[in-house]
Amino acid sequence: RQIKNRIDSKFYEIIHTDIIIKSTDSPLEGAKRGKETSMWLAIQSVKEKKAGIVISAGNTGALLVVAKLNLKMIENIDKPALSALWPNKKGMSVVLDLGANIECSSKNLIDFSIMGASLYTSLYPDEKPNVALLNIGSEELKGNETIKETYQILNEKNSLNYNFAGCLLYTSDAADEHRRV
């Protein structure tokens, strides 16, 4: 089946290139493959406002490096985060980071909560999102020091943009209980 049979061609453009970033490339090797790779061209299309989003099934590390080289970061945000929409019985959950960052500080996790809540609100403007930390358990005392510190900060912080719902051990029942970021 061809894409054009499923999606109206006015919504996409295919730009061919023979230069690829391999899944076995390190993030830096991928970025060094240059400005003619499909990933670089896709990110460049967002920078030039020819596209609003990039969807990639390619090398995740290279995607983050190429994006960081080409796109401006939001002021005071140190790390980018991948996001995904996960369906649940009550709707959708927005999940950030998705394992893209091996190590995060509590500041990074708080930044992710703000970015995730903002994304959720842009998709569902009539709902106030619930933010939860994915953790090894739902109890406040579980997790490493970074998770515990982040929990305390988010729990004490009054946000007009979202409700803090604590820690979440991700199960299908937990996801269905609330629409969460």
Region locations from a protein language model:
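N-terminal phosphate-binding or glycine-rich loops at protein starts, especially the Walker A/P-loop
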Residues: R1-I3
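Phosphate/nucleotide-donor binding subsite
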Residues: K10-A51
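Short glycine/serine/threonine-rich phosphate/pyrophosphate-binding segments
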Residues: E36-M39, T60-A67
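Short, acidic/small-residue loops that bind anionic groups at enzyme active sites
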Residues: V66-L98, K157-G166
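Acidic/polar active-site rim loop that often engages polyanionic ligands
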Residues: K89-I102, K128-I136
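Glycine-rich phosphate/diphosphate-binding loop of Rossmann-like nucleotide-binding domains
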Residues: S106-G166
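Conserved small/polar residues in nucleotide/adenosyl-binding loops
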Residues: Y170-H178
